[in-house]
């Protein structure tokens, strides 16, 4: 049991008879005095895969479920299944493409360090990514000299199909860091 304001992204809760995995949380602070802060949570139903959205007050009590997290690396593709290998005991974890379609946009060809598989009682629930990923820009409009003074952005496409907005001075072939949850440019990589 935990209060709604203690729930974090990647947690699992039981609510209205459903097992839900927290994908995103929006915090809405009230403008009136005495009103309580609202937590708008977006979930994925673990059993059905459906997206669910609920609102909670900060002191609402939710029933939390303990998850097991295992560090994994991307191994290979088998038909429409993606196989991830446990870093310690080499257990393979299989995901259908539909299950991890969003996550695949952030996994470059060489893999992504820091990935984890979430399980409940041995059942694979989800693939969790780290907060940031470093990727090389495949395609963007040419960089403009002296554009660092302006705050204008342009779209940049990565090899995985992901498109993010980058500053005008960034060129194709540059390595950038992307914040995964917010899908935004954070800076250049060394």
UniProtKB/Swiss-Prot annotation:
GO BP terms: peptide biosynthetic process
Domain of life: Bacteria
Record's GO cellular component terms: cytoplasm
GO molecular function terms listed in the Swiss-Prot or TrEMBL record: translation elongation factor activity
Pfam families for this protein: EFP, EFP_N, Elong-fact-P_C
PANTHER family per UniProt: ELONGATION FACTOR P (PTHR30053), TRANSLATION ELONGATION FACTOR KOW-LIKE DOMAIN-CONTAINING PROTEIN (PTHR30053:SF14)
Family under the similarity heading: Belongs to the elongation factor P family.
Protein name, per record: Elongation factor P-like protein
Source organism of this protein record: Photorhabdus laumondii subsp. laumondii (strain DSM 15139 / CIP 105565 / TT01)
